[in-house]
Curated annotation (Swiss-Prot):
One of its GO terms (cellular component) is cytosol. Keywords: Riboflavin biosynthesis, Transferase. Belongs to the DMRL synthase family. Pathway: Cofactor biosynthesis; riboflavin biosynthesis; riboflavin from 2-hydroxy-3-oxobutyl phosphate and 5-amino-6-(D-ribitylamino)uracil: step 1/2. Catalyzes the formation of 6,7-dimethyl-8-ribityllumazine by condensation of 5-amino-6-(D-ribitylamino)uracil with 3,4-dihydroxy-2-butanone 4-phosphate. This is the penultimate step in the biosynthesis of riboflavin. GO terms for biological process: riboflavin biosynthetic process. Pfam families: DMRL_synthase. InterPro entries: LS, LS/RS, LS/RS_sf. This is 6,7-dimethyl-8-ribityllumazine synthase. One of its GO terms (molecular function) is 6,7-dimethyl-8-ribityllumazine synthase activity. It comes from Wolinella succinogenes (strain ATCC 29543 / DSM 1740 / CCUG 13145 / JCM 31913 / LMG 7466 / NCTC 11488 / FDC 602W). (2S)-2-hydroxy-3-oxobutyl phosphate binds at S86, T87, R128.
Amino acid sequence: MNVIEGKLNLTGNERVAVIASRFNHLITDRLVEGARDSFVRHGGKDEHLDLILVPGAFELPFALEKVLAQGDYDGVCCLGAIIRGSTPHFDYVSAEATKGIANVTLKYGAAVTFGVLTTDNIEQAIERAGTKVGNKGFEAMTGLIEMMNLYKNIGA
């Protein structure tokens, strides 16, 4: 059986965008740093990594649509932090951000990863932004690198 998979290395020529929400910036700033760390560790050049900031997670799909329509990037990493509160707002924002990112990704057939935390409380978010459970921004960028290379291997 022939196995086709993406590798975890970059040539240094790849252009990548990170789209991150500013809301809950104490968390998302750490996710962005994790993504940047992964990009550089795997051979990416810092000057080929662009950070696009949006107000909140709900706006991520709209920015993603614009970025993919321009066709300037080899991949896009979406980052955010949605923390449950006492109202249904969490459910609406997390559902729409998730569906929106998935729909735009499918529309363009692009290498995109979803690094949006959806947590019950601030403690869980902190744990996933570089403490107990690792850094989900790092993981999202690592997944993006693998997917960009997989797309090259399957001719996408």
